């Protein structure tokens, strides 16, 4: 479905974290982001000649309807007030039969109540942090990554090597990830004004409503990642 002749889009590309991987595999990648991060993406991906950059939001109609061979939006649409409308805007850009990959924050529908309570406590912290001036917000989220995410993941990794089940420990997903990823995700998690969460069933229904079918969910963290194909 995706080849070196394909053209697609990265909706909410940020600093180009996923675009770096995808651009190597396709003919043209359209990176779209409404924030200053699009400039960071340009710098990070300057060696790629097959990327177009657009400072725009999901509903700005930057690309032609039904023009794209694939699309993805990873960890972005749950920060938009009307996530359903944003998802539908992405899908309308796809050609019939084209795949769309999405990652939306889960509502802990596959976790314990204690896990959910820990998140609620962290969400109170997020509501304090996102109102801070940008430089202070970035400094705090970097500190969270360096002094909370990273040490905890080292402990989790050691526990796993000792044969302990770590699947229900918060942040265990990051045990094999770089500090750069932790910094990026901490900023995404704590530095945004709106964070919505959805159950697997809800996401499935949203994707159907947006015009996708043959929907499949990943059984691995992070949750929920799903792919569907435009009808």
What is each PLM-predicted segment?
Residues 2-7:
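Short helix-loop-beta connector
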Residues 9, 15-60:
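Class I SAM-dependent methyltransferase SAM/SAH-binding core
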Residues 60-71:
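A short acidic, Gly/Pro-enriched loop at the edge of an enzyme's catalytic core
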Residues 69-81:
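A short SAM/SAH-binding and catalytic strip from SAM-dependent methyltransferases
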Residues 84-96:
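A short glycine-rich, Lys/Arg-flanked "PGG" loop and its adjoining helix->strand segment in the class I
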Residues 99-131, 141:
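Conserved class I S-adenosyl-L-methionine
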Residues 122-199:
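C-terminal alpha-helical "lid/dimerization" subdomain adjacent to the S-adenosyl-L-methionine
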Residues 173-231:
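C-terminal lobe and adjacent flexible extensions of AdoMet/dcAdoMet transferase-like proteins
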């Amino acid at each position: 479905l995706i080849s070196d002749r394909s053209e697609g889009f990265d909706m909410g590309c940020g600093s180009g974290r996923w675009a770096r991987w995808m651009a190597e595999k396709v003919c043209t990648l359209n990176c779209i982001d409404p924030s200053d991060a699009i400039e960071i993406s340009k710098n990070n991906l300057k060696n790629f000649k097959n990327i177009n950059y657009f400072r725009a939001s999901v509903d700005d109609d930057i690309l032609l309807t039904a023009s794209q061979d694939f699309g993805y939006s990873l960890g972005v649409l749950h920060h938009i007030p009307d996530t359903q409308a944003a998802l539908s805007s992405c899908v309308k850009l796809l050609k019939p039969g084209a795949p769309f990959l999405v990652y939306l924050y889960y509502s802990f529908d596959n976790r314990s109540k204690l896990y959910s309570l820990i998140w609620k406590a962290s969400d109170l912290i997020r509501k304090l942090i996102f109102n801070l001036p940008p430089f202070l917000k970035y400094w705090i989220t970097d500190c969270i990554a360096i002094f909370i995410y990273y040490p905890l993941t080292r402990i989790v990794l050691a526990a796993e090597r000792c044969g302990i089940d770590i699947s229900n420990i918060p942040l265990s997903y990051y045990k094999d990830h770089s500090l750069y990823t932790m910094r990026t995700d901490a900023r995404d998690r704590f530095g945004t004004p709106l964070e919505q969460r959805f159950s697997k069933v809800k996401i499935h229904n949203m994707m159907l409503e947006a015009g996708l079918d043959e929907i499949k969910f990943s059984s691995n963290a992070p949750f929920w990642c799903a792919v569907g194909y435009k009808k």
